[in-house]
């Protein structure tokens, strides 16, 4: 008599299901109640995440397009690097038009063409949470969104309390009429809170904060200075306040780089990319933190190169410390989209992402590691309970 898969021991079922590609987990959960419960268990989640994050030589990324998000892997080597699309991630519906995405340890904060709300999504678990904004985010005359954003969480014992930070520290189109605003949304309480940050005197030069170990980081410059970017500043999601500015590496700032971008390295370190806009525009440096605490940071140089007119300033970048490889996304050859892969030996490979013409979001790529973080559903309000 043949044995049905549903009659197998639970540990065998967990092992089998853990081999299912992440993009197909929604179908697994819908198969039966038992499989749905298994897929949500802590043991199974750790098993599948370990399998997804230890594929040899591959970096998992999400390609962002207006109506869909696609999971892909990038195999990095100095002979034949390649990109492989794993398939489209199931979102809410094709009518949801995505404008921008922020990644935080497996959670995606998705901004829509509908400027009145955002949605936080865990592609691994399929959980979503819609958040209504207090007011739309593009307030400037040009409709450019000058708000800064970050998604993060506070550790509360065995669980994590997800929070969404949104602030406006400078409006360059109206320098004489500055109306700063700092607010945070708590997923546990389902409430927005206005933060008292009246003495904040640093201007962030990136719209999206990079999350690392409970804090979100931005490159900044003194609001009263016209100097180059020489510090980073962080927001502590537990204390719900900004910490002191931390210096960028002097070895880079003394060269007068005018462009700085940040990235997270394996959820453990920060990487900083430096490049000139005009002079020495083909030279760039990347530094990585060796230690980062509340009031101090130390850096180590990862890479410095001059590649001539081969690469443009990357919108997003990633590094592989073990392989000494830099991956940067450029948009110079629009409508085509490329990842530049650069190694320590100064080799350069361009990988065409084959993004359909006219489909563009910012950032167009984000790194991805599956996460078991639970997105709490909003509590029923009194009027909802009465229905």
UniProtKB/Swiss-Prot annotation:
Domain F-box per the UniProt entry, residue ranges: 2-47
Alphabetical list of InterPro entries matching this protein: F-box-assoc_dom_typ1, F-box-assoc_interact_dom, F-box-like_dom_sf, F-box_dom, SCF_F-box_component
Top-level taxon in the UniProt lineage: Eukaryota
SUPFAM superfamilies in alphabetical order: F-box domain
NCBIfam families given in the database record: F_box_assoc_1
Protein name: F-box protein At5g41490
Source organism of this protein record: Arabidopsis thaliana
